[in-house]
């Protein structure tokens, strides 16, 4: 059978067709396209209309090539962001991006209504201004007209599914990033909504991965040249990526390495202790029904911003070359990757230079120096978070699985092994698509819960790094 994975990241999106045959999984990337943020009227948006058009383009290619053999499609995206639907079923506005500044300073205001400790016991999430609950609370405080017109709130993957099928639902793993869901009951939390005066009527039924949302609508079937069911997968991309990891035992952690680095481990139930709150971990849903205990860390956003800046200046930004130069660099300067100055600076290079100057460190002189600085800084942060995970869970961590695009960065993988003292298993690069497709195949009955298909082709390889290497 064939399954479509639509994977939307903060910088790009892909439509991938996966085939499982005799327990072997192969992938075919059908369509790739850029994603970007749009600044308009002092607000930062995602261009959902363009993204949906690209999704349709990918589906047209998939149906043309594979036709009636396609069983279903699953959609995953980044977390927290959402779109609002009016009473006529129309999108009110392009979704606001989590990097918009409307939530600046919102935490203190929210804690006046709902104390931090109580808030954490309910939702179990890391407190970040970007979280859905604070985006929605800022809209309430602004008396946002869009909110008054809204009848439904749909997270980004739910939004794509809605305009494919006409059916509205909130998928569990993406809902768990919102900080509005009770981590124990897995339902929308009445206390959070009432204390912050949030419109609970906008929320939809929470559905689990593997749920069939619906079939592609008739009009779209004609436009796309085919049809299939839309299946809720691990709609938060990290949940899908984690579903691709074939780990045994519990002495392991994962890093989903992309624009963000999401580092954590799996626990059977939410950990809501004061120690977990102090360490700033988040409890989010896993495809398995377990909990992803993790921390959101600024990731390759740092390098992506540098590359964007250098490219605009006409500089050569071949990634492999920069990694090779970084391996030869003797720059030992580091930054605090979570410092707010690196969230959305006008110039990432200048922000890094200023930080080094203020902390009496050597200012990088070459692209290789900047590559090493970023990778070393991330590896140091991973080592710190690893220790916090061990303290919070009472487990020893001996292996770290790095999945996603960042798993291709050999320098980062080597430094992570050295700084954490752990064996690092890097790959597969296509973990998110693999996990997405595995959920669909299980929903179709082609895979059982414990089945792990053999991975074949590009983007499937694993590479191991040892601390002494």
Where do the protein language model's features map onto the residues?
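Short, basic and Ser/Thr-rich N-terminal targeting/leader segments
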Residues: 9-11, 69, 76-78, 132, ...
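Short glycine-rich phosphate-binding loop at a beta-alpha junction
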Residues: 69-77, 152, 205, 392-404
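N-terminal glycine/serine-rich phosphate-binding loop of ATP-dependent small-molecule kinases
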Residues: 1-93, 121, 149, 221-230, ...
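Short acidic-aromatic active-site loops that bind/stabilize oxyanions
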Residues: 44-52, 125, 129, 206-210, ...
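Short beta-strand-loop/turn "lid" adjacent to the catalytic site in phosphate-handling enzymes
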Residues: 40, 64-97, 126-130, 161-182, ...
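Carbohydrate-associated surface elements
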Residues: 100
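Glycine-rich beta-strand-to-loop/alpha-helix junction loops that act as flexible
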Residues: 76-79, 209-210, 257-260, 399-407
